[in-house]
UniProtKB/Swiss-Prot annotation:
Keyword annotations from UniProtKB, A to Z: DNA-directed RNA polymerase, Nucleotidyltransferase, Transcription, Transferase
A GO molecular function held by the record: DNA binding
Protein name: DNA-directed RNA polymerase subunit beta
Subunit structure: The RNAP catalytic core consists of 2 alpha, 1 beta, 1 beta' and 1 omega subunit. When a sigma factor is associated with the core the holoenzyme is formed, which can initiate transcription.
UniProt-listed Pfam families: RNA_pol_Rpb2_1 (PF04563), RNA_pol_Rpb2_2 (PF04561), RNA_pol_Rpb2_3 (PF04565), RNA_pol_Rpb2_45 (PF10385), RNA_pol_Rpb2_6 (PF00562), RNA_pol_Rpb2_7 (PF04560)
Classification lineage: Bacteria, Pseudomonadati, Spirochaetota, Spirochaetia, Spirochaetales
């Protein structure tokens, strides 16, 4: 165990401990499967799988005679064929059988038939938050998407209100500010006037519409009020004579008033535009946009003044023709259809989130209605018109109140919902088509749609990803990732700058630093350290409550919506022993503004300075002294650090290292307190303190050199001794890239910031040979090679050491079965598994046919189809596995067995490997220098690494200098430090430590040249820096081709290492050779070394025979060009110097030869 010294400016202990870092995965899946609640038979009815089955059942047959009812579901743990480890080894999925109990009820007779019906298998989550699918660990990444609900926004001159449901048709309102009309769009189809839409939904008269949206005032009609009334709008129809009606919404003229007076109208109802705010709880409007829509209606239907209302038929016709153009219309059907689009639970679902958002926006208390109501539509229109008039403000689409997170559970629920709707359709068909009394529950349910949907989701969904397993931090970050892409999300090409940008609501919820560089920047982000997802899917972050200027220890989690307009102080605001603020003015933030406030006005206080960043950013010491771009690179590169054989924990840490190791799931923790009985490299046994009997022991299997998804090595090493007492939760074995239970991604090295003979030009790194000799950066990489033994039409393939036409020397690494021996060192081209395949009759010569007929099967020829070590790979065989049908029961069709060989290679640090610090300071090893040639300190200590000082000023990552200084002090004082982010050690503190260690307080020292022994002219900054070796190793990239595959059409060599391809000689390379007049070099590069087929063969012949050569024919690409032109209709022929035609195809050659 390491004892760390806390060097932060704040207190060592936090107010609130970090939550379990992978709880977003674990909680979401538990909510989906509800295994704990199932045991007590009390699952929540509106969550996860339970809600899926409750939505679909009961099902009734069309004739009403039979009903299929659902009782409960359960997961059969006994059906688990393999453990997690076996699944990985045998390429199987870790899943259990799902069954549901159904009752088939005959309504006429009352008979009930009960059956537990198989519903396919369901992948189970491991305690590390991953799934094992076909032997590989996968992670379901959480998706961040637009929240259902209502949103108001503006684009160009158009104001929009959009009601987004969880499932169903989108409803969009838009105001065209140039024309002052309000339109409705359903599912982005053509526009409909809003008044027509309202009439179709039941507000069928002008009076009803006006009464809904406007405050109405009564006014007497007399000579005194004439002037006041003129130009105002009627709110209620006035009928004077039989054929004389003044309609609500019409403008009143002087002539109209005269008519009123003559006909004895004493009082009229007018629209009160000014009183829109005078009635509490009512959202009245002051805009005349709706009245303009009445005018537009009149023009549309050619109505004259004095005519009555629009008929129901004409309204429905107008609306329905836009919804379903070209469909025959009956008025009742049209009305039904329109109502079911928004008001029926089958077709429309706001989801509890959508309803919550609508109620929050309009101040309603309803949290249960899942469909739209007329009130929602009226409120939305009123709010949009109030925004248009400037009485309300637009929404911010990128506000985290308008974006929510869908985690594993919800994604899976949606998959099951889609599949179950297909199951329901099939079941209903079967109910009506089969003989009723012969029905059985299991015959009605078809499992295929469910099985295929779940399989497809886990295998191919954009959100189901191959786990990044390079190191524990990479695993952890992958599980905490938020992705805006994927089904129902954004697309990379259409996402603009605003969506990707940092928003003030991200504070404490999403990390502003950690995101990929490149096209996905800002679309893939990381969860902040303390963030949680609430029941509605909104991100929440914790705050300490402040009451009357006094800070309490009460913690409240707030979502972005709740946090709006609250006044929040920073975590490092100075507080005295009585929890009162020391300063009179405190630095705070309110929404997006940063200001100062008196303590009395403060509502909340941050929990910790690191709450606004993600886990990997919180591992960077002195983060606040780095430029954010470099911090981003530092966060991303820590995830690429390869686990080393002998890692060390960083001398300068941030206090997060232990937490990351503990929550990542790679270390082994004690389940119960007890005494260690056995501790070997493969197994630990602990006798718990509260054991039930002597056989009640806790056993732990340790992983030894297992392969990860990224071909790194997964290995456990024991941290305890036999007889030792351990506590519950204590770390008893280290995993990859952990040391003493802490994350240890690299090593501490003695660094000098000094240029050295140009070897560290442009970020290159100069390294001492000591590092290589002592294996400080040696890592183990394990590759898996597999081969299938198939049943062919000509007979089975065989695994054997008896391979035709192969020398005994090559076969001496195989055992008698034809499988390579464990422990053998293999090189490229070596045979790992000898396999022969029967040859087809077509390949056999007449002589062989004769022998076969004489000697029978024995003489049948076979083809060598052995598994060989590919180019660029060598290493030691550490394991061989044979998987047969007896082992797993379901190999792919036609496959008898699968053989896997694991080859491990120890990779030392070498020139070309990429290294990096934690501050985005990356570089490639340019030279490994003998220890005696490295620059050394006055006491003779040689440096381990030389970095270029020019890599610091322009990159603005000063954190690396501060880390080096403090690391130097720590090394000589034998101390390890915790330097939490945003409250790191001050310069004074670092200088004090340096003095204590006996160094100059700038940590600059005189260095001596290893070649000459002379001191360098100036003092050099020296320190201890933590460096990582990244997963960009030169061994994986180094590639050379002699002869290899060619592309079929162009006959040019393929490209890339995977295809064993060649180097591309492009347009610009040709210019370079032309500039030097290197005609012959250029000719051979463009012909015989590329795609001159006949020339290639000829030159090979000449080289073998030793004849001086200068052959070149016509490159194949020229022929391709010619054929391309012929395809366009040009008849082209080519001729040589002597006027003879050169054939381009074999057909042409024949023709020319004939003539």
């Amino acid at each position: 165990m390491i004892k760390r010294v806390h060097l932060g400016q704040g207190k060592a202990e936090e107010i609130l401990d970090l939550p379990n870092l992978i709880e977003i995965q674990l909680n979401s899946y538990e909510k989906f499967l509800q295994l704990d609640r199932l045991k007590n038979n009390k699952p929540l009815l509106n969550e996860g799988l339970e809600s899926v089955f409750r939505d679909v059942f009961p099902m009734k047959s069309s004739n009403g005679e039979v009903a299929l009812e659902y009782e409960k579901y359960y997961v059969e743990y006994d059906s688990l064929s393999f453990t997690e480890k076996e699944c990985k080894r045998k390429g199987q999925s870790y899943e259990a059988v799902l069954k549901i109990r159904l009752n088939l009820q005959f309504l006429t007779t009352g008979e009930i038939r009960q059956k537990d019906v198989y519903m396919g298998t369901i992948p189970l989550m491991t305690d590390r938050g991953t799934f094992i699918v076909n032997g590989a660990e996968r992670v379901i990444v959480s998706q961040i998407h637009r929240s259902p609900g209502v949103v108001f926004y503006k684009e160009k001159d158009l104001y929009y209100a959009r009601i987004i449901p969880y499932r169903g048709s989108w409803l969009e309102f838009e105001i065209d500010s140039k024309k002052d009309y309000l339109y409705v769009k359903i599912d982005r189809k053509k526009r409909i006037l809003v008044t027509l839409f309202l009439r179709a939904l039941g507000l069928d008269t002008r009076e009803k519409i006006i009464e809904t949206f406007y405050k109405i005032k009564k006014i007497e009609v007399n000579e005194d009020t004439k002037r006041e009334i003129t130009g105002q709008y009627l709110a209620v129809n006035i009928t004077i004579k039989e054929n004389m009606t003044y309609r609500a919404g019409d403008k009143i003229t002087l002539q109209d008033i005269e008519d009123f007076l003559q006909n004895g109208v004493k009082e009229i109802d007018l629209i009160d535009f000014d009183g829109y705010d005078s009635v509490p709880g009512k959202h009245f409007i002051s805009s005349d946009v709706i009245l303009n829509c009445f005018e537009k209606e009149d023009a549309y239907f050619s109505l004259k003044d004095g005519f009555k209302e629009l008929s129901r038929e004409s309204v429905m016709l107008a609306v329905y023709s836009v919804l379903l153009p070209g469909e025959p219309i009956s008025i009742d059907n049209a009305e039904n259809d329109l109502r079911t689009v928004f008001f029926s639970e089958k077709r429309y679902d706001l989801g509890h989130v959508g309803r919550y958002k609508l109620s929050k926006k309009f101040g309603l208390n309803d949290l249960t209605t899942s469909v739209l109501t007329m009130t929602d539509i009226v409120n939305t229109i009123s709010h949009l018109l109030r925004i248009y008039d400037g009485h309300d403000v637009l929404d911010d689409i990128d506000h985290l109140g308008n974006r929510r997170v869908r985690s594993v559970g919800e994604l899976l629920t949606n998959i099951y919902k889609g599949a179950m709707s297909r199951v329901e359709k099939i079941a209903k068909d079967r109910m009506s088509n089969k003989e009723v009394f012969n029905l059985k529950p299991q015959e009605l349910i078809s499992v295929k749609p469910i099985v295929s949907a779940v399989k497809e989701f886990f295998a191919t969904s954009q959100l189901s990803q191959f786990m990044d397993q390079v190191n524990p931090l990479a695993e952890l970050t992958h599980k905490r990732r938020l992705n805006a892409l994927g089904p129902g999300g954004l697309s990379r090409d259409r996402a603009g700058f605003e969506v990707r940008d940092v928003h003030y609501t991200h504070y404490g919820r999403m990390c502003p630093i950690e995101t990929p560089e490149g096209p996905n920047i800002g679309l893939i982000v990381s969860l902040a350290t303390y963030a949680k997802v609430n029941d509605y899917g909104f991100l929440e972050t914790p705050y300490r409550k402040v009451i009357n200027g006094k800070v309490t220890d009460e913690i409240e989690y707030l979502s972005a919506i709740d946090e709006e307009k609250k006044c929040i102080a920073q975590a490092n605001a100075a507080v005295n022993a009585e929890s009162n603020y020391i300063d009179d003015l405190i630095s705070v933030r309110v929404s997006g503004d940063y200001t100062t406030m008196i303590p009395k006005n403060i509502d909340y206080m941050d929990v910790s300075p690191r709450q606004l960043i993600s886990v990997s950013s919180a591992l960077i010491p002195f983060l606040e002294h780095n430029d954010a771009n470099r911090a981003l690179m530092g966060s991303n590169m820590q995830r690429q650090a390869v686990p080393l054989l002998f890692p060390q924990p960083p001398i300068v840490g941030t206090g997060m290292e232990r937490i990351v190791a503990k929550d990542s799931g790679v270390v082994i923790k004690a389940k119960r307190s007890g005494t260690v009985v056995l501790a070997t490299s493969k197994r630990i046994v602990i006798r718990p303190d509260n054991a039930d009997d002597e056989h009640d022991l806790d056993e732990y299997e340790l992983a030894k050199y297992e392969r990860t998804n990224q071909d790194t090595s997964f290995n456990h090493s024991v941290l305890i001794k036999e007889g030792q007492v351990v506590n519950k939760g204590e770390i008893i074995a280290d995993g990859p890239a952990t040391r003493y239970g802490e994350l240890a991604l690299g090593n501490n090295l003695l660094v000098g910031f000094i240029p050295w003979n140009g070897f560290n030009y442009e970020d290159a790194i100069l390294i001492s040979e000591r590092i290589v000799k002592e294996d400080l950066y040696t890592s183990i990489h394990i590759k898996e090679f597999s081969i299938e033994v198939r049943e062919t039409k000509l007979g089975p393939e065989k695994v054997t050491a008896d391979i035709p036409n192969v020398s005994g020397k090559i076969l001496n690494k195989l055992d008698e079965n034809g499988i390579v021996r464990i422990g053998t060192y293999v090189k490229p081209g070596d045979i790992l598994i000898g396999k022969v395949t029967p040859k087809s009759e077509g390949d056999i010569t007449p002589e062989f046919k004769l022998l076969t007929s004489i000697f029978g099967e024995k003489a049948k020829d076979v083809k060598n189809n052995s598994l060989k070590v590919p180019h660029g790979t060598e290493g030691t065989v550490i394991d061989v596995q044979r998987i047969t049908k007896n082992d797993v029961g379901n190999l792919p069709p036609g496959v008898d067995e699968i053989l896997k060989v694991y080859v491990a290679k120890k990779r030392r640090l070498k020139e070309g490997d990429k290294m990096a610090g934690r501050h985005g300071n990356k570089g490639v090893v340019a030279k490994i220098l003998p220890v005696e040639d490295m620059p050394y300190l006055a006491d003779g200590t040689p440096l381990d690494i030389c970095l270029n000082p020019l890599g610091v000023p322009s990159r603005m990552n000063i954190g690396q200098l501060m880390e080096s200084q403090l690391g130097l002090a720590g090394k000589y004082l034998s101390e390890y430090y915790d330097v939490p982010v945003f409250e790191s050690a001050t310069n004074e503190c670092i200088q004090e430590k340096l003095k204590k260690a006996g160094f100059n307080e700038t940590s600059k020292a005189i260095l001596y040249d290893g070649y000459t022994g002379e001191p360098f002219e100036n003092e050099v900054m020296v320190g201890i820096i933590y460096m990582l070796k990244l997963h960009h190793l030169v061994d994986d990239k180094m590639h050379a081709r002699s002869t290899g595959p060619y592309s079929l059409v162009s006959q040019q060599p393929l490209g890339g290492k995977a295809q064993f391809g060649g180097q591309r000689l492009g347009e610009m390379e040709v210019w370079a050779l032309e500039a030097y007049g290197a005609a012959y070099t250029l000719q051979e590069l463009l012909t015989v070394k590329s795609d001159d087929m006949s020339g290639r063969v000829k030159i090979y012949e000449n080289i073998v025979k030793g004849i001086p050569t200068n052959v070149s024919g016509i490159p194949e690409s020229f022929n391709v060009l010619m054929q391309e032109l012929r395809g366009l209709g040009f008849d082209l022929s080519i001729y040589d110097d002597n006027g003879n035609q050169i054939p381009l195809t074999e057909k042409e050659e024949e023709l020319i030869n004939k003539t």
